[in-house]
């Protein structure tokens, strides 16, 4: 029993030792894991910081690239502007060079002219032919003088001619000296001559002559186009047309007057409306009508149809159209128009006025 108890105790002690060893190992492992995790965290932090730095540098590089691009665009614009300005300068230099060439040509021409003048001056100085001409008050002082001479003369002839070209005694003689008029005087004279010619052309006499000539030409043209006989015929036909127009106008006025006279008046329509309510006077009116109706019917038979009233004013086709036309009946006689029956009826007193109503009725 004791042996078993000691063995159990030993086992317990061994187990306690093993548990202590495992606990120590677990603690060491946890410490190592913690240290490793700390290192890993520090490494991750360093990596993140480096990434942030790289991103910042990348942004800075992008900004720098953008600024470089903007500078390049500005440079290109400035380059294009400078190119345009240079082209303008080239054009201006070309124009200036052309102008300079023109100026050089003008200067050369002036130099040639100056040389000619100098040569002439030297010749004049050599000859020493200066003359002073004095005019009286009556004569106008000339603007310029010119001497008539031959340039092909030799020196000996010129020496002989010195006596000939002496100033003349008679100032009125123009044998060797003549006065050249200035340009302004010539222009004045030519202007005056033009004005005088215009005044002469537009004078009253010339205008009258031109009018007479034009009238003659127009009359000749008229006689060529239309002969006087034809003109007379045209005038006569115009007068006939006027007369026919006046006749037509008069006939139209007569026709209008006849229509206005034949139309019934407003009073007749009013009296017909009043007649319907007054039947008492019908009997008395019929008695009077019977006495007078016979004579009126007889007269109406003697009268022709109504279309013959205006036979004078209507033309032949209109007269034929105005005739009454009746439809043909087979096997029957053509009916003749019956005469108008006229009846007079006494009118009722309206506003103290008495009048007779004339009713025209076609017998049916």
UniProtKB/Swiss-Prot annotation:
The keyword Membrane applies. Its main location: cytoplasm. The modification Phosphoserine is found at residues 172-173, 355. GO terms for biological process: cell differentiation; muscle organ development; positive regulation of transcription by RNA polymerase II; regulation of gene expression. One of its GO terms (cellular component) is plasma membrane. Keywords: Activator, Cell membrane, Coiled coil, Cytoplasm, Developmental protein, Differentiation, Membrane, Myogenesis, Phosphoprotein, Transcription, Transcription regulation. It is found in: Cytoplasm, Myofibril, Sarcomere; Cytoplasm; Cytoplasm, Cytosol; Cell membrane, Sarcolemma. The keyword Phosphoprotein applies. Residues 44-77, 202-226 form a coiled coil. The modification Phosphotyrosine is found at residue 326. The modification Phosphothreonine is found at residue 336. Residues 1-24, 231-283, 311-339 are annotated as: Disordered. Residues 231-256 have a biased composition (Basic and acidic residues). InterPro entries: Cavin_fam. Belongs to the CAVIN family. Component of the CAVIN complex composed of CAVIN1, CAVIN2, CAVIN3 and CAVIN4. Interacts with CAVIN1, ADRA1A and ADRA1B. Interacts with CAVIN2; this augments the transactivation of NPPA. Interacts with CAV3. Interacts with MAPK1 and MAPK3. Modulates the morphology of formed caveolae in cardiomyocytes, but is not required for caveolar formation. Facilitates the recruitment of MAPK1/3 to caveolae within cardiomyocytes and regulates alpha-1 adrenergic receptor-induced hypertrophic responses in cardiomyocytes through MAPK1/3 activation. Contributes to proper membrane localization and stabilization of caveolin-3 (CAV3) in cardiomyocytes. Induces RHOA activation and activates NPPA transcription and myofibrillar organization through the Rho/ROCK signaling pathway. PANTHER family: CAVEOLAE-ASSOCIATED PROTEIN 4 (PTHR15240:SF4), CAVIN (PTHR15240). The coiled coil domain (residues 44-77) is essential for membrane-targeting in cardiomyocytes. This is Caveolae-associated protein 4. It comes from Homo sapiens (Human). The lineage of its organism: Eukaryota, Metazoa, Chordata, Craniata, Vertebrata.
């Amino acid at each position: 029993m004791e042996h078993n108890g000691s063995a159990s105790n030993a086992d317990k002690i061994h187990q306690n030792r093993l548990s202590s060893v495992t606990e120590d190992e677990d603690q060491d492992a946890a410490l190592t894991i913690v240290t490793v995790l700390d290192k890993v965290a520090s490494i991750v932090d360093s990596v993140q910081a480096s990434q942030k730095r790289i991103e910042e540098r990348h942004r800075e590089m992008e900004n720098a690239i953008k600024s470089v691009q903007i500078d390049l665009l500005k440079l290109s614009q400035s380059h294009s502007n400078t190119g345009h300005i240079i082209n303008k300068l080239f054009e201006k230099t070309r124009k200036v060079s052309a102008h300079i060439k023109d100026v050089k040509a003008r200067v050369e021409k002036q130099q040639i002219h100056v040389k000619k003048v100098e040569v002439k001056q030297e010749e004049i100085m050599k000859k020493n032919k200066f003359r002073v001409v004095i005019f009286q008050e009556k004569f106008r002082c000339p603007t310029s003088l010119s001497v008539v001479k031959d340039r092909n003369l030799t020196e000996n002839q010129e020496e002989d001619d010195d006596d000939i070209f002496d100033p003349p005694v008679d100032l009125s003689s123009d044998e060797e000296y003549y006065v050249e008029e200035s340009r302004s005087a010539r222009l004045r004279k030519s202007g005056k001559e033009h004005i005088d010619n215009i005044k002469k052309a537009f004078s009253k006499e010339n205008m009258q002559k031109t009018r007479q000539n034009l009238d003659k030409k127009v009359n000749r043209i008229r006689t060529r186009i239309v002969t006087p006989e034809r003109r007379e015929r045209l005038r006569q036909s115009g007068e006939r047309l006027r007369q026919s127009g006046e006749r037509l106008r008069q006939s139209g006025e007569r026709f209008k007057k006849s229509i206005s006279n034949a139309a019934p008046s407003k009073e007749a329509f009013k009296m017909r409306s009043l007649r319907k309510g007054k039947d008492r006077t019908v009997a008395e009116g019929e008695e009077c009508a019977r006495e007078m109706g016979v004579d009126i019917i007889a007269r109406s038979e003697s009268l022709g149809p109504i279309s013959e009233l205006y036979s004078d004013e209507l033309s032949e086709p209109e007269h034929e159209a105005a005739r009454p036309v009746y439809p043909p009946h087979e096997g029957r006689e053509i009916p003749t128009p019956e005469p108008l029956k006229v009846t007079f009826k006494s009118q009722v007193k309206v506003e103290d006025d008495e009048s007779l109503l004339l009713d025209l009725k076609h017998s049916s």
